Amino acid sequence: MAEAKTGAKAAPRVAKAAKAAPKKAAPNDAEAIGAANAANVKGPKHTPRTPKPRGRRKTRIGYVVSDKMQKTIVVELEDRMRHPLYGKIIRTTKKVKAHDEDSVAGIGDRVSLMETRPLSATKRWRLVEILEKAK
């Protein structure tokens, strides 16, 4: 048994057929082949990056309740929802800080906001337009 094991290991393996080296084309042929390949290739070899669509940005309409800060307004956003059990419409409000570059909005103005990247620790909205000036 020991001889059979050693005999199996000692048996020569069947060699794989050697790959034939590809023929090299003459210099004039290489230029012709390169020009032909260049005509067939339409872009880079790697996969080009496709632009991903940006997520939909939230837009909200609310009333300015404070304009005391520089280039910042505080807007009160109102949300109305129906109570799941009793059906009564409940009004909830939320105050958000919004960027007002030119400081044009005043207290009581009805404004349109759009979500944006974080501009400060608490500011994530920007003023799009003033829909109605306060009286």
From Swiss-Prot:
Origin superkingdom: Bacteria
Function recorded in the entry: One of the primary rRNA binding proteins, it binds specifically to the 5'-end of 16S ribosomal RNA.
One Pfam entry name: Ribosomal_S17
Gene Ontology molecular function, alphabetical: rRNA binding; structural constituent of ribosome
Subunit structure: Part of the 30S ribosomal subunit.
Lineage of origin: Bacteria, Bacillati, Actinomycetota, Actinomycetes, Mycobacteriales
Chain positions covered by the region annotation Disordered: 1-59
Keywords: Ribonucleoprotein, Ribosomal protein, RNA-binding, rRNA-binding
UniProt entry tagged with the keyword Ribosomal protein: yes
GO cellular component: cytosolic small ribosomal subunit; plasma membrane
Gene3D superfamilies, A to Z: Nucleic acid-binding proteins
Note from the entry: Was identified as a high-confidence drug target.
Family: Belongs to the universal ribosomal protein uS17 family.
Protein name: Small ribosomal subunit protein uS17
